[in-house]
Amino acid sequence: MQFVYDPLPYRVIFGAGSVRRVADELSHVGSRALVLSTPEQAGSAQELAATLGDKAVGLFSKAVMHVPVATVDAAAAVARELDADCTVAIGGGSTVGLAKALSLRLDLPSLVVPTTYAGSEVTPIWGLTEDGIKTTGRDKKVLPKVVVYDPDLTLSLPAEMSIASGLNAIAHAMEGLYAFDGNPIVSLMAEESIRALARSLPLIKADPTDAKARGDALYGCWLAGSVLGAASVALHHKLCHTLGGTFDMPHAQTHTAVLPHAIAYNAPSVPEAMERASRALGGGDPATKLYELAVGLGAEMSLAKLGMPKDGIAKAAALAVANPYPNPRPITEEGIVQLLSRAVEGLPPITA
């Protein structure tokens, strides 16, 4: 056995009511915090700022999707004016992305309080958008110093959004099982993530106020984000990035529809990873079980219904083959055409 494990340096506080610990945990980060949120969560941000007392020097509630450079400019100006020495971000991917951008630009450390299942708070991946062009990169300095997970803050997350985000997280974990730069710790986190999410998402669909299921789902998404931050992705993510960029398809829903087919494609080359996935999903063929899980949760499995033109299959396959991510099974145009043809129609995956 040979591997490299380079753990990411962040502190995690997890549990119902943990948001009450933010003021104490801020001592690990700084003493003059600029609190960040989207306009929609400004009220929650104000409440959080109030609990911080004089440790909160101001509020910036203009975070938006895709982290526009203009928004970062505005937030950086406020941070400088208030002499902030850190940020506290409450919300989902948009707010976390802004906190990361400020860490990158101003070296401001952050504390993050996630209220969605995005998982980006535990990855060193950052992104910025300017003039319609998105630039991404990896840098450990954008990682929050502290992440406070309070499942109670996710109780109001709509079930449909929870399911889409949760299935998206399963995709991160599944590919972590066979990442070329994976290791035993990543595999353990990935398997546990899949198990927690497969168990909790049906319960959330049945009762979105189920506090235990919400805790399980948030736990699973933390693990999935940790996997994404520690290991590379493969065919599944390449296909989803290609479809999203080429046909402007919805991110999480595209992941859900493609995943069973990508797993079926790679399964013959990664038997040990499939054993782990099967165990996490309660037995059986992982690709089939993932398809059945998604259908049972009411997810749309047809790429055509999500916006992909049927005449776009050949183009997508050519793009995927032209610049592939490292993958355990060789990627062929013929194989991808077959895979996408079934995903476009929403059919079950072809398994061995």
UniProtKB/Swiss-Prot annotation:
Its EC number is 1.3.1.-. Pathway: Xenobiotic degradation; gamma-hexachlorocyclohexane degradation. NAD(+) binds at residues 93-94, 115-119. It comes from the Bacteria. Keywords: NAD, Oxidoreductase. It is an enzyme of class 1 (oxidoreductase). SUPFAM superfamilies: Dehydroquinate synthase-like. CDD domains: MAR. InterPro entries: ADH_Fe/GldA (IPR001670), ADH_Fe_C (IPR056798), Alcohol_dehydrogenase_Fe (IPR039697), MAR (IPR034786). The maleylacetate reductase family of enzymes does not require any metal ion for activity, despite being related to the family III metal-dependent polyol dehydrogenases. The keyword Oxidoreductase applies. Belongs to the iron-containing alcohol dehydrogenase family. Catalyzes the NADH-dependent reduction of maleylacetate to beta-ketoadipate, a step in the degradation of gamma-hexachlorocyclohexane (gamma-HCH or lindane). Has an essential role in this assimilation pathway that allows S.japonicum UT26 to grow on gamma-HCH as the sole source of carbon and energy. This is Maleylacetate reductase. It comes from Sphingobium indicum (strain DSM 16413 / CCM 7287 / MTCC 6362 / UT26 / NBRC 101211 / UT26S).
